[in-house]
Structure formats: structure tokens, C-alpha cells
UniProtKB/Swiss-Prot annotation:
GO-annotated biological processes: modified amino acid biosynthetic process
Protein species of origin: Polaromonas naphthalenivorans (strain CJ2)
EC number: 6.3.2.2
UniProt cross-references to Pfam families, sorted A to Z: GCS2
Transmembrane segments: none
ATP-binding recorded as keyword: yes
Protein name: Putative glutamate--cysteine ligase 2
Domain of life from the UniProt record: Bacteria
Keywords: ATP-binding, Ligase, Nucleotide-binding
Entries under NCBIfam families matching the protein: gshA_cyan_rel, PRK13516.1
MF annotations from Gene Ontology: ATP binding; glutamate-cysteine ligase activity
Function summary: ATP-dependent carboxylate-amine ligase which exhibits weak glutamate--cysteine ligase activity.
Catalytic activity from the UniProt record: L-cysteine + L-glutamate + ATP = gamma-L-glutamyl-L-cysteine + ADP + phosphate + H(+)
Length: 381
């Protein structure tokens, strides 16, 4: 199969996908209600789409094409309210977070869809372990070469995205000591990691054709890269975010991506090189393990600095772009989070420290998702 042409899209347009947990309301374990939720959600007029995911205790929701973080928040609010309404009818709850803290992977059921059955046959138990929950952010690019240049510039900021969204400290009932343990499950797949270093669509097409010739891949869907081009949408898709506990944080992350994209496309602050990736996996590990307390190694200088300082420095650099895009509320929410050393992983650990019962933590997280408790500090009102 040949690589499809890169479609035109509006530069800096946004699309957000969220993979959500479905839990019962008696012990707050995962519950196989995807089909029922899809049936109920199909009766509600909504932007974007609601689709099944790999296992039957999760669904994916997405916005339509948006042009501002305010528009993202408006659409996610409609979708969130519909999710809550549908879940209430089924006596279940919808929860954010990158992992379910105590679910047992072997109890999961693969959703009955040909592609999911095919992946289950190929990847075995990894498919059930892939009951993890991420946020994907699409950003529109005016042409294919700009998309690749933006992709490789954005790769320097992967640790930012991981630390700011981290919400998966618990796996199988244990504190993993990682802020984002979810990504450890992604790394097990053979076509995960980072995209090849190609700065023109012609170069990328050569790479894709070579891979297709081997029979290893058939389409871009077969790549599980941290950032990948989506030629059918005219976007690049950033895939390292854990699903946040609130739609406000999900929106803020999209606003941050859009502001970075504006900085890259308008100011051309640096030219990416292959050597940027010498410290890529180290920086990614640091962010997964330590979150906002990570060390960041600057790919250009080799200098070490606290990741939180690099995030705050970057936010200052892109402030005027955020203002122009009406994304200042997004930056403010995330800046406040960094200054308070407060991400969703910390929130989950603090709740567990108080409650000593992960089921109660999930109950509170479900309430937080529906807007019931503990709103995000700063940012959106």
C-alpha cells in the first residue's frame, strides 16, 4: 500500500482525542460497557466522534476541527456532559487517568472488531495490557514538509507533554514510582518510539515505501510513534499524553501544543537535527519516571537543568503566540501547575495517601471528571 498524499489543513487547527475509562460504581473496577455507551452516545448530537477502543472497558471520544483552545473546551464540555449522562443511565462512571490503578489485565475483553481481533492475534497478551488511556492532540500543518519540520521540533518538548499530563502512577494495585507508567506499555510494541529523521515528504515517502515493501506495515496506523504524521487529516498527531483527570487540563495541553506550533512555524527558532535524538530516550524516561521533578538534557547544548525550569522558560518564550491564539488561559493553568509541582499523578498519590483505598481514589477521580470536586488551579474559569 502506498503512502496517501498529505492533505491541506488550516495551520494550527486542533483536534483532541481522549481514551476514557469505564468503571462500575460498586468497586470502581473497569467494566465492559463500551457497546452500551456507544449505543447511548449515538443518540446524542455531538461534535467529533465516539468510537470503541482495544478492550471493552474503554472508549475514545474526539472533538471536531477546532481553531482555539476555547473551542476545544466547548466541544469537550459537550462530550463530557454526554458521557456523564450516558454513564449515569448505566450506573457506571467515566474516569480520566492514563492507567486504571488496580485492574487486572488478564480480565479484559478484546472489543469485537476485525482490526482489534487482528492486533490481538499479533500481539498476544500485550493487547490486553494495552488497556491504557491516552490523549492525542492533532495540530494542522499547511503542507507536508512543514508537518515534518514541526514534528521534529516538537520532539524536543516530548518531556514537557509527558510530565504535564502524567496521570498513571499505579499499575495492578502498586505504586510504580513512575508518574507516567502508561508509556512503559507503549514501548513494548515494535513500531513505537520516535519517527525517522526525515525533513521532506519525499524522504519520508521513501522510508514508508521501504517499510511497506518488507510487509511489516500497511498504513500509518501501524506506527505507534510518539508523534506521527496523519496525511489524511493534514496534521501531526502527538500521542504521549496520559488522559488527564479533567477536560480543563486536556484543553490546556492542546493550547500549549498550538502555541508551540505557532512559535515553530512563525519564528523558526531552531533547525532540528538527527543529533537531537541522542538524548531523546533519556529525556523521555526522566519525564515518565519523575514527572515535573525530572532532569532535562538540552539536545543542542548538552546542558542539564530541571525540567520544570525548561517548561517555564519555554512558556515565557511562547507567551505572545499564546496571547495571539487566545491560549493564555491554557498556559496559565499549566504554569500554575508547574509552579505548584502539581500534576495529576501527584493528585492521585495524595488521594491514596489520605484514603488508603484505590477504589475510593477512582470514585473521587470520576467525580472530578464530571466537574464535581477539586477544579484545576488557575486557567479556565
Amino acid at each position: 500500500m502506498s503512502l496517501e498524499p498529505f492533505q491541506k489543513s488550516s495551520a494550527l487547527s486542533l483536534g483532541v482525542e481522549l481514551e476514557m475509562q469505564l468503571v462500575n460504581t460498586h468497586d470502581y473496577d473497569l467494566a465492559p460497557y463500551a457497546e452500551d455507551m456507544l449505543r447511548l452516545m449515538s443518540k446524542i448530537a455531538l461534535p467529533g466522534a465516539v468510537v470503541p477502543e482495544m478492550t471493552s472497558s474503554m472508549i475514545e471520544v474526539s472533538t471536531g476541527i477546532c481553531h482555539s483552545s476555547a473551542e476545544v473546551l466547548g466541544q469537550l464540555t459537550q462530550i463530557r456532559d454526554a458521557l456523564v449522562k450516558s454513564a449515569d443511565k448505566l450506573n457506571i462512571a467515566v474516569v480520566g487517568g492514563g492507567t486504571h490503578p488496580f485492574q487486572q489485565w488478564h480480565e479484559r475483553r478484546i472489543y469485537d472488531k476485525p482490526r482489534f481481533r487482528e492486533l490481538s492475534e499479533l500481539y498476544g497478551y500485550l493487547s490486553k495490557q494495552f488497556t491504557i488511556f491516552g490523549q492525542h492532540v492533532h495540530i494542522g500543518c499547511p503542507d507536508a514538509d512543514t508537518a515534518l519540520l514541526t514534528l521534529h521540533r516538537m520532539s524536543r518538548y516530548i518531556p514537557h507533554f509527558i510530565a504535564l499530563s502524567a496521570s498513571s502512577p499505579y499499575v495492578q494495585g502498586q505504586d510504580t514510582a513512575f508518574d507516567s507508567a502508561r508509556l512503559n506499555s507503549v514501548f513494548a510494541f515494535p513500531l513505537s518510539g520516535r519517527a525517522p529523521f526525515a525533513l521532506t515528504w519525499d524522504e519520508f515517502t521513501v522510508y514508508f515505501n521501504k517499510m511497506a515493501h518488507t510487509g511489516v506495515v500497511k498504513s500509518m496506523k501501524d506506527f505507534y510513534w510518539d508523534i506521527r504524521p496523519k496525511p489524511e487529516f493534514g496534521t501531526i498527531e502527538i500521542r504521549v499524553f496520559d488522559t488527564p483527570l479533567t477536560i480543563e487540563r486536556a484543553t490546556a495541553l492542546a493550547g500549549y501544543v498550538q502555541s508551540l506550533g505557532s512559535w515553530f512555524m512563525n519564528d523558526q527558532p531552531f533547525m532540528p537535527t538527527e543529533d537531537d535524538y541522542l538524548v531523546y530516550t533519556y529525556n523521555r524516561f526522566q519525564a515518565c519516571r519523575f514527572g515535573l521533578d525530572a532532569v532535562y538534557v538540552d539536545p543542542a547544548t548538552g546542558g542539564h537543568m530541571p525540567l520544570r525550569e525548561h517548561i517555564l522558560m519555554t512558556m515565557a518564550q511562547i507567551e505572545r503566540h499564546a496571547h495571539r491564539l487566545d491560549a493564555s488561559a491554557s498556559i496559565h493553568l499549566l504554569r500554575t501547575s508547574v509552579e505548584r509541582n502539581d500534576n495529576d499523578a501527584r493528585w492521585l498519590r495524595e488521594r491514596q495517601g489520605e484514603e488508603r483505598l484505590l477504589a475510593e481514589v477512582i470514585r473521587q477521580a470520576a467525580d472530578r471528571f464530571r466537574g464535581g470536586v477539586d477544579h484545576e488551579p488557575g486557567g479556565f474559569s
